Amino acid sequence: MKLLLAIALMLTIVMWVSTQQPQAVHTYCGRHLARTLADLCWEAGVDKRSDAQYASYGSAWLMPYSEGRGKRGIVDECCLRPCSVDVLLSYC
């Protein structure tokens, strides 16, 4: 009985692992990158950074160094090589 239960458990685990697919990766460049990022961020409920946010840093150019990922990084990660939706969402 224990052997049958162990075999059933192992079969269940093997079937579950085989159905788990890694997240698809694609290359996103230019307008396709901008549109995809805008759509994903909109669906996630993230708004574009406003000018009011820049005011607390003194200059707009200081903001990328203080929080989040810079815009140049997304091209490196998603245009020059494939990236997943999770990586794109990290730039929202």
Curated annotation (Swiss-Prot):
Pfam families: Insulin
Cellular component annotations (GO), alphabetically ordered: extracellular space
Keyword terms of this UniProt record: Cleavage on pair of basic residues, Disulfide bond, Hormone, Pyrrolidone carboxylic acid, Secreted, Signal
Primary location: secreted
GO molecular function: growth factor activity; hormone activity
Domain of life: Eukaryota
Keyword Disulfide bond tagged: yes
Record propeptide residues: 50-70
Signal peptide (from-to): 1-19
Disulfide bonds: C29-C79, C41-C92, C78-C83
Transmembrane region(s): none
InterPro entries (alphabetical): Bombyxin (IPR017097), Bombyxin_A (IPR030680), Insulin-like (IPR016179), Insulin-like_sf (IPR036438), Insulin_CS (IPR022353), Insulin_family (IPR022352)
Localization in the cell: Secreted
Family membership noted in the UniProt record: Belongs to the insulin family.
Note: Silk worm has two kinds of PTTH: 4K-PTTH and 22K-PTTH; there are many forms of 4K-PTTH.
Protein name, UniProt field: Bombyxin A-7
Originating gene: BBXA7
